Swiss-Prot record:
<keyword id="KW-0379">Hydroxylation</keyword>
<keyword id="KW-0528">Neurotoxin</keyword>
<protein>
    <recommendedName>
        <fullName>Alpha-conotoxin OIVA</fullName>
    </recommendedName>
</protein>
<feature type="disulfide bond">
    <location>
        <begin position="12"/>
        <end position="18"/>
    </location>
</feature>
<comment type="similarity">
    <text>Belongs to the conotoxin A superfamily.</text>
</comment>
<dbReference type="GO" id="GO:0030550">
    <property type="term" value="F:acetylcholine receptor inhibitor activity"/>
</dbReference>
<feature type="modified residue" description="4-hydroxyproline">
    <location>
        <position position="11"/>
    </location>
</feature>
<keyword id="KW-0964">Secreted</keyword>
<feature type="modified residue" description="Cysteine amide">
    <location>
        <position position="18"/>
    </location>
</feature>
<dbReference type="GO" id="GO:0099106">
    <property type="term" value="F:ion channel regulator activity"/>
</dbReference>
<dbReference type="GO" id="GO:0005576">
    <property type="term" value="C:extracellular region"/>
</dbReference>
<comment type="function">
    <text>Alpha-conotoxins act on postsynaptic membranes, they bind to the nicotinic acetylcholine receptors (nAChR) and thus inhibit them. This toxin blocks the fetal muscle subtype (alpha-1/beta-1/gamma/delta subunits) (IC(50)=0.51 nM) with 600-fold greater affinity than the adult subtype (IC(50)=310 nM). It blocks the elicited currents completely and it dissociates very slowly from the fetal muscle receptor. This toxin causes an apparently irreversible paralysis upon intramuscular injection into gold fish.</text>
</comment>
<keyword id="KW-1015">Disulfide bond</keyword>
<keyword id="KW-0800">Toxin</keyword>
<keyword id="KW-0872">Ion channel impairing toxin</keyword>
<keyword id="KW-0027">Amidation</keyword>
<keyword id="KW-0629">Postsynaptic neurotoxin</keyword>
Length: 18
């Protein structure tokens, strides 16, 4: 979902920083 305009996708999920 990284780079995709989706409100359900958080940056920390894509960057594995959660």
């Amino acid at each position: 979902c990284c780079g995709v305009p989706n409100a359900a996708c958080h940056p920390c999920v894509c960057k594995n920083t959660c």
